[in-house]
């Protein structure tokens, strides 16, 4: 299967297209046998069906973007430009338009110059209150639960702090996101990376080197924190204290040693000899998890699609057959 890329976005769509351009450039390099690119995608999953589009390791398959109602409905002036493809914007328009237009031109360029056909299967916009962490967490968390069996990469440069913090937190709760990545550049309106030229056979190796220099990942481990916290919460029941050995057994069930207890010490759990009690943040964290764990994901997604919270973008021009 391919990779699901999730991201926030504001009024600069380059926050989505810059890292995607980097990934597609590395895909070109991988297809050409450049070892650094092959190593980059080494641990990405493959489709079982031989010869399928997703057989290429790390190929983007679905794009899921979280943003505000105004951005989705085209009530914000967007800032973007592409020197590669002569695109520019500065008026109110729906955020998917420049993203799809740019990707269409990028895919055509790649096909013409490298004889490689790239496409997307799906592109979704998800409406969030971009200044409300709880709303962002609920929307992102439920969708991550739906993507539990997919390979998911999280783009950390787009959207508000609330969206990105919710992505980090929900990712830790669900253990769904395998990469949290970011790429920075000075010209934030630019839709392509400013530190590489438009890919060609002459510069693809140098472009690969530059991308790998700029590509950064957050070293976050997927520990299914939500499930761990819920199990510990159930342990307390109506008790004010539990024995430390009971907590250790829960950690052991997740393959974690007792040294992991230090991660909970203080605001989450308090320790007094062999007794453990709830810290001041314990119930807040458990309640967050309940926002996304105690729902029927399929029904919620259906409701969100019906009410316009989730909207599938028309990408016929770049859709995979």
Swiss-Prot record:
It comes from the Archaea. This is Uncharacterized protein AF_1865. The lineage of its organism: Archaea, Methanobacteriati, Methanobacteriota, Archaeoglobi, Archaeoglobales.
